[in-house]
Amino acid sequence: VDPYWMIPHFEKMLYDNAQLLGVYAQAAVATGEPLFRRVTAETAEWLLRDLRSPEGGFYSTLDADSEGHEGKFYVWTPDEVRDLLDVEQYEPFAQRFGLDRDANFEGQWHLHTFKSIADIATDLRLDEATVETRIDEARARLLEVRNQRVWPGRDEKILTSWNGMTIGGLARASRALERDDLAGAAVQAMHFLRARCWKDGRLLAVHTDGESRFPAYLDDYAMLAWGLLELLEARWDADALAWAVELVDVMLEHFTDHEAGGFYFTADDHESLILRPKTFSDDATPAGNGVAARVLIRLGYLLGETRYIDAAEATLRAAHAAIERYPHGHGTLLMALEEFTSPPWILVLRGESDELDVWRSEVDKLYDPHRMIVAVPSDAKNLPAALASKKALGGAVAYVCRGMTCSPPVPTLAQLVRELRGQ
């Protein structure tokens, strides 16, 4: 990018957008800012429209180039846009996105936000709602025309770890936007990975050209497990919980460094390497050890499994020196450390599905990144003991837990909201 963050590298990556989807969804809930809500919705729509395979998995990238030129798919000229729009649409659009200024990318215009809606409304003597409507109509028209251009190449590898992040991002967006279809897309991606990338109790890392291959790495197990936990917060799914447990147990059995703590990048039965790598720092994606620790903490407290908490502690102890030396590079492990030292709130709702939907919707409006919420229908079967012990008592009830200690059941939504606001 340039110093002004105006011109991007035009390649679009699944892992970037999956993470941003979750971040904007959280920001929308935390702030109530309409812009964040809009970006969440538009990012989700883009993922579903441009990167989802017919079977429900998600492809890896859209290239930067088309027809041999970087960014050609995305740039415009004022004359092109003027020919496509009504006069009343063009003027606010041009001011908003710089078509009334000099070209900003190789003699053409990459659409960049230059002027606020409020300033445009003042300049054109219109109300802000009218300006927004006209700009939205213009964007829709340009998207329609852009889709008729020669598309950038698409890398149609489906990577397990990146799809795990996408499941998590879609689940968060589902909650923030109250759109169950996004949770449905996350479930479909889960089913795709289970059908195509899970064989004999182990994950495969890549699906491409109709085949799945390569033994999965730590990141695949950890990020998919994290995505499944996020999905459980958006929609009760017994299969998601059971698979998360399976993934974590494989991770503990085959990736653990039993001497120093933490997890190796490769399994103990992976092809022999001169050195088995074990990394703690974040890169373009979160560190596998950091994600694993966060999964172990949350799943451990949800299910009352102290061995998961112990494994998370061993990981944090193993990473301590690296975190202390360069904390900025270990954000994921720092988030895990925060939840290890101050356990997350685990909120278990029990009752009929329709009533649970109302309770969860209200609770989701109370932003708390350190709270995990699971709404378990009263007719759910074969529950783990820690969830089965939390009974549905006629109507909906809530169990508020911190660490391994839970409150008596909270019998009304109003009381629950009061208690959560007081935390």
PLM feature segments, named:
Residues 1-423:
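Glycan-recognition and catalytic cores of secretory/periplasmic carbohydrate-active enzymes
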